[in-house]
Amino acid sequence: MNKPKINVVKKIALPKRGDSLDNLAGYPTKFELPLMEDISGKYINTLYAVKDITVDWNAYKDHLAKVKPEFHPHVLFVGHDSSEIENITLMSLGGVLQHMNGKANYALLGHNNINTLNTIIKNKQPEWIGFNLYTGLTDFVFEWIKHYKIERASHILKKNIFDFDTADKALKDMVREAKGPIYEGDQVLYAPIIIGGHFNNYSFDESFVRGGDYVVRGKGINILRDILLGLFVPGIYHDPMPYANIPRMDREVFYKDMYEFSDKTKGYVFSK
């Protein structure tokens, strides 16, 4: 089932009741994983200590510009087109990108137009693809991921691959070795799949088996930051800590991408 292999720290120290959950330093200066524990072989708990989290996102942005001047991650966030409220999850995650000197694009899609994603990827050239999945609205997404992975694995390995499990394992192994996207020069050959959302509350294992390279259960602010930094290997991760360190939401680009295809307030990209 292509489960991840990871060294897990056994001694764990978490904030106690009444302890401050605010990182007074503003952000971590080292790029290292938090303490982690294996939950019965199901997923990895990422136990971020206060010192591990970013709370001053503007200062963190300036810090990254100094120590990683060439670092500009680009993520395409994909959600469902069935909701009439703002997708604050995607906008919050987009805020992480903004404060890492990166770029986010957005698409809200349904089962009738999921294949439009191929055109978006060709035009936008993201380094990562992040899905926010809801229960009951997943089969067409997993079908798209299946075809995407088979096509990309065949292209990269220069041979015809027809079996999804073979393609999935090959790409996960490549992502593990590269610690992120697969490139040929400046060209992105494969943008790893990150899957989050309510679907992962119970079906996290299905998300991984059906193509997610990185599956995030629970709040994804801290995990996304460290995935983009190349700290995590493919696997299933859960952040149980209740830190309120959400950055400023990326509303401007979210609505720009919405209105590129619709002049309605609802603004669902490709929802026609």
Located regions from the model:
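Acidic, low-complexity intrinsically disordered segments
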Residues: 3-272
